[in-house]
Swiss-Prot record:
Gene that this polypeptide is encoded by: xseB
Name of this protein: Exodeoxyribonuclease 7 small subunit
Assembly and binders: Heterooligomer composed of large and small subunits.
Domain of life the protein comes from: Bacteria
Originating species: Burkholderia ambifaria (strain MC40-6)
Region named Disordered: 1-22
Enzyme Commission numbers on file: 3.1.11.6
Coiled coil: none
């Protein structure tokens, strides 16, 4: 006997659903998926489909962040330096000057 999907369920994602246009849309969809999964009302099949979709969205978001990081590196060149924890909290002390 086949189980029918609940009325609010989304169809399974077989990897064919297109990715969002941008990072913000992907992140919003990912947050919605997580909330639905944490709600516990999804069937096993829907949970698996949501997990797969979420994994695709996470990979997409990581790629977008890497692209932006690379663009920042190109724009800033060699001037990028890690911010040390004490740099922002110095009281007017200019060690580099």
């Amino acid at each position: 006997m086949a189980k029918t999907a609940s009325p609010g369920a989304t169809p399974p994602d077989n990897g064919t659903e297109p990715l969002p246009d941008n990072y913000e849309m992907a992140l919003a969809e990912l947050e919605t998926l997580v909330a639905r999964m944490e709600g516990g009302a999804l069937s096993l099949e829907d949970s698996l489909a949501a997990y797969r979709r979420g994994a695709n969205l996470v990979a997409f978001c990581q790629q977008q962040l890497e692209k932006v990081e690379q663009q920042v590196r190109v724009l800033d060149g060699a001037t990028l330096k890690p911010l040390s924890s004490g740099t922002a909290a110095t009281d007017g002390e200019d060690d580099d000057l």
